Amino acid sequence: MSLTQILLILFVGILVTTPHDIFIIIKELKKIKAYLINIKSSIVKNIDEPLETEQVNFYLKKIINLEGYYHGSYDLTTIKEKYYTLIINNDLIENESVPDITEKH
């Protein structure tokens, strides 16, 4: 079907529609839009799930290397918070144990 045929069909369709039909068409277009948004979110969710699992595993390995164990929620944000608090605490401990050579005695 060529572009001119499609345009001709649309033009004739617009000419024969009644005001009642316009509301039905708008309603159906909204349903199609909602369906497409649902498909898009489903695709994005299926792509993001493995990435989130990889991130959780990455941070868990880092936490276990620092602390030796992990007890808590396996939510990505919780694990990230735990990791960053461990990093900050380890940096503070390392900074306290290193003598300050700039001090004059």
From Swiss-Prot:
GO terms for cellular component: membrane. Its main location: membrane. InterPro entries: DUF2672. It is a single-pass membrane protein. Keywords: Membrane, Transmembrane, Transmembrane helix. The chain crosses the membrane at residues 4-26. It is found in: Membrane. It comes from the Bacteria. This is Uncharacterized protein RC0089. It comes from Rickettsia conorii (strain ATCC VR-613 / Malish 7).
